[in-house]
Amino acid sequence: MIQFQPVLGSLKSYEAGKPIELVVREFGIDPDQIIKLGSNENPFGCAQPVVEAVQKAASKMPYYPDDSYLELKTALASKFDLTPDRIILGNGSDQVLDFACRCVLGPGDSILINRITFAMYRIYALQCGAKVHSTETVLHDLNAFLDLAKSIRPKIIFLCTPSNPIGDALFKSDVYDFLRQIPSNTLVVIDAAYMEFGKKKDSNTFISAKEVTDLFPNVFYTGTFSKAYGLGGMRIGYGIGSKELISNLYKMRPPFNVANLSALAATEALKNESHVESYLDNNLKEMKRYEKFAAEQSVEFIDSYANFITFFARKRGKSSTEISQSLLKQGIILRNLRSYDLNAIRITIGKPQQNDRVLTALNQEFS
């Protein structure tokens, strides 16, 4: 019998949002009538020039990409005003998070995370044999982080801001005050997958990748093309840090870890920032409709700096599982946060007509 690593006994695979195909099989609903607002994807998709560029380059599929990815890294370097050797690309930003864990953690080491946060931090750490410590608060509390950091001395601290899965955000000034109190030999990962949305809502939440990694060489800043840029299906993200950090992370990177068409799509997306701005405008406008609904129905929610909103189901008679299942039967895919030990649902902000349908359905559930 194969002897598997003991840590696998305590590991659970990441639970992704329900795909449209599964809902079709489960409920027999016409796929064209299904609204997928459970995985925080861009409902408008990527910019049309990105689609055209990928279609034009389809003949490149048989060939490996340029493993230096210099064109994309140069474009990102220009965007962030730094040099390409401070950037590493990944098959989604979660891959560069994996690089960081494997580069720093060993058996018996510790990480520090928020109680409610992106599940992959825990998974990657456990895969390395590390211990996972978390705060007790739902929202990020940097004082709680500091208290724990002093006692457990973690090798890595993860700050997800704006937060996945619930959308709260930290102010830049508070993050900088926190970083000044963290030992320089502790890696602090700032997961900025939703930073574009936070910046749009309140510039005080914006953390510059260049500035923070210049001031604090122990910071690793990660971002993605999956959310604001609408390239979730292309699986491409990036990490930014000091030259020393990036050069060591590269030792964990497999060859050709980003597909050539994905790299091309990301490069083209950076030339079409107006598409992103249009989406951010829609997100902010439509978010207010959900906030208005919550106020009218006395539904508790979390002030969100991302492209989704979290509604709590407590004191409403129905659980988050019942609500999400009821909407699923109507062809509306939301995210039930019960797996995070929250009696809450999370709704990706969609197109206006999609939100019309969701709000009508939610009115029936919460009234």
UniProtKB/Swiss-Prot annotation:
Pfam families: Aminotran_1_2. It comes from the Bacteria. It catalyses: L-histidinol phosphate + 2-oxoglutarate = 3-(imidazol-4-yl)-2-oxopropyl phosphate + L-glutamate. Keywords: Amino-acid biosynthesis, Aminotransferase, Histidine biosynthesis, Pyridoxal phosphate, Transferase. GO terms for biological process: L-histidine biosynthetic process. Its cofactor is pyridoxal 5'-phosphate. Pathway: Amino-acid biosynthesis; L-histidine biosynthesis; L-histidine from 5-phospho-alpha-D-ribose 1-diphosphate: step 7/9. GO terms for molecular function: histidinol-phosphate transaminase activity; pyridoxal phosphate binding. InterPro entries: Aminotrans_II_pyridoxalP_BS, Aminotransferase_I/II_large, HisP_aminotrans, PyrdxlP-dep_Trfase, PyrdxlP-dep_Trfase_major, PyrdxlP-dep_Trfase_small. The keyword Magnesium does not apply. The modification N6-(pyridoxal phosphate)lysine is found at K227. Its EC number is 2.6.1.9. Belongs to the class-II pyridoxal-phosphate-dependent aminotransferase family. Histidinol-phosphate aminotransferase subfamily. Homodimer. HAMAP family: HisC_aminotrans_2 (MF_01023). PANTHER family: HISTIDINOL-PHOSPHATE AMINOTRANSFERASE, HISTIDINOL-PHOSPHATE AMINOTRANSFERASE-RELATED. This is Histidinol-phosphate aminotransferase. The gene is hisC.
